[in-house]
Each structure stands twice: as structure tokens, then as C-alpha cells.
Amino acid sequence: RACGREGDDITSRLFLPNDFMRVDADYAAKQSGDWVPGDWPRTYQSPAYPNIFAAGIAFAPPHPISVPHTSPNGTLIAPAPPRTGMPSAEIGKTVARSIADMIGGADRPTRTASMAEMGAACVASAGAHLLTGTAASMTVYPIVPDFERYPRYGRDLNQTFGEIGLAGHWIKILLHHMFLYKAQLRPGWALIPE
């Protein structure tokens, strides 16, 4: 439950029924064929409360990123976009910079980070041994399919791929140590990507 200054219930103005925050997305009910990249948020600002933002897992996606399906036993499969890791970091930096600019005098968010315009990379490692481990490595661009720019698949296939193998496991180990280095703000930490 969210309360306003006077103690009034503002939950429905701030959140959708799924308890994720309503932001600058288009939440109108649409058929999957009518979904467009412009449905997705760009600033992550609450339309009701301009001083509130929701980055990463906190914002409510306007819809799944692909057509929902049902498994043979009736389980709904409705893929949602990745809102942790790399996308969260980019969105968080964008929101933080907009807030800093607004503190400095801007009257609205100055930065944008639409998931329909950004890519993501993920490495899921299995096993701990340096020579026998394996990993699934994948990239996707854009995160939210854009059938206007990429009519056949909704994504740029030159920048969207996946691979399973030992090299991905080594990348995961390297990234693990780089992110710990970055988290400790060691020299050159800002050069390490999200």
C-alpha cells in the first residue's frame, strides 16, 4: 500500500495491479500484433509523481516481449524482458543522471534508455572448473523486438546470437572478477562496462 502526504491511498496511481510501478510506458491493452517499441518506457518516471522513478525490476513492463503461449499442461508462458543485470545498470545510470540534472534545474528527465533501443548480453555459467565448465552466452539487440526496423524477426541478427561452450565459462569468470573490481571502485573501474 502506498500513501500520499495526507495518508490517502495512492497505490492505484503509483502501481499496476501486479505491484510494479507505473512509468512512462503505454499500458493500454493491445493485441500482440499491435505492440510497438514506443510502448516501452524511456525515462522510467512516474506520470503521477514526477519526483519518483522506477528502474530495473521495479518498473511495470507494458506487455510481454513475445506472443504468450501455453504449455501442454496449461501453464501460461509469457516472456518478460530481462530487467536485471546489464539492462538494469543502463536504466539505473540513465535515471540517476536525469535526477541529477533535475536537481540542477532541469524541469523533466534529460536522459532516456528504452529497452527497445538497447541490447543486452548474458552469460549463464554451469560448473566451476576452469577446464571443464561450460556456459550459455547470448546477446540480443534490441531487447524488445522491433518489427518496424527488423521485419522478419524483430531483432538485428548480426548482433543477436547465442553459443554454448567453455569460452563462455571463461568470460563468466573474467566478468565476475571485473565486476568485483568495479564494485570496489579500484583504479580504472569506470572503464569496465555494465
Language-model segments: what does each one mean?
Residues 84-87, 91-194:
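C-terminal, flexible cofactor-proximal segment of oxidoreductases
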